[in-house]
């Protein structure tokens, strides 16, 4: 029985470490990516997985070591995994409708710094021209709204 407890504790610890590592990858993606759409992808996909792994690890730890099953942890798992992607989808949709900067591969420098802002990679005229094109596209498609 003691060996089983140790194995489950090890599984819980590995899940916590994996969740922390994936959260670190998510943070790097948020800093590295150039526009709101890529950043929202990094924030949603990997942080949802990191929270999932972390909470499952905590749930296993509590069940094995204290014999306590937390319904709150289970509800947190369900709530976060349902609301995080939906919330980020709404943020990305609002950004798209408001004409947010959209990264294009040809605009970026090949060896840009990790902290280089997306606006520093493009000229003001190019950004204004793209914003004007997006506005014309929006007027064409959403004139009934």
UniProtKB/Swiss-Prot annotation:
Segments traversing the membrane: 11-31, 51-71, 72-92
Localisation: Cell membrane
UniProt keyword Membrane, yes or no: yes
Primary location: membrane
Keywords noted in UniProt: Antiport, Cell membrane, Ion transport, Membrane, Transmembrane, Transmembrane helix, Transport
Domain of life: Bacteria
GO molecular function, one term: sodium:proton antiporter activity
Signal peptide residues on this chain, from the entry's feature table: none
Membrane topology designation: Multi-pass membrane protein
Annotated GO CC locations: plasma membrane
Oligomeric form and interacting partners: May form a heterooligomeric complex that consists of seven subunits: mnhA2, mnhB2, mnhC2, mnhD2, mnhE2, mnhF2 and mnhG2.
Family under the similarity heading: Belongs to the CPA3 antiporters (TC 2.A.63) subunit G family.
PANTHER family, alphabetized: ANTIPORTER SUBUNIT MNHG2-RELATED
Name of the protein this chain belongs to: Putative antiporter subunit mnhG2
Organism: Staphylococcus aureus (strain JH9)
